[in-house]
């Protein structure tokens, strides 16, 4: 897990989500033991394991969906430490029964907000290979959010360096 301020990128992503949400469902796969050891004693973090994690993120969303017990949920990546309370609040204020996909200058981002019904329909879509494809087949709204952070995930060493430079 990559360092971020006084913790890790995942620590920051979870902390930011918990500023708005009352719990986080954390789906582990690769490095599951490390993740479990780090977060298992936090009552507002529910850890689920995806044995098929190597098959892609969509399988993790399917595993996490089984732990959703609220009317709506956000879906985001654990490598997006710059999402904050304001971003979650803006998207939440627009909630409806559709999938709300935030965009920055037309580029889709995160967190995506879904009703539980919409989530269950999306993960049940036949012949889709990823969540975005599943969401776009169902009822959805693309919502413009004037905040580049919704598109800034840290996937490469260059992304990590750029993110660190933004926070110096």
Q: Model features per residue range: what roles?
A:
Residues 30, 100-117:
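Short beta-strand-to-loop element that shapes/binds the nucleotide-sugar donor at the catalytic cleft/hinge
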Residues 42-55:
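Conserved donor nucleotide-binding strand/loop of the catalytic core
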């Amino acid at each position: 897990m990559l360092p971020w301020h006084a913790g890790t990128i995942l620590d920051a992503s979870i902390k930011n989500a918990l500023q708005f949400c009352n719990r986080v469902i954390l789906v582990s796969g690769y490095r599951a033991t490390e993740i479990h050891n780090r977060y298992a004693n936090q009552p507002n973090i529910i850890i689920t394991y995806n044995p098929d994690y190597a098959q892609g993120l969509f399988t993790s969303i399917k595993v996490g969906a089984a732990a959703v017990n609220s009317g709506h949920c956000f879906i985001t990546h654990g490598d997006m430490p710059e999402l904050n309370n304001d971003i979650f609040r803006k998207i939440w204020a627009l909630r409806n029964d559709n999938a709300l996909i935030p965009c920055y200058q037309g580029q889709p981002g995160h967190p995506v907000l879904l009703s539980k019904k919409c989530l269950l329909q999306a993960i049940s879509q036949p012949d889709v290979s990823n969540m975005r494809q599943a969401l776009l087949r169902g009822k959805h709204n693309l919502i413009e959010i004037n905040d580049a952070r919704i598109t800034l995930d840290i996937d490469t060493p260059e992304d990590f360096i750029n993110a660190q430079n933004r926070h110096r």
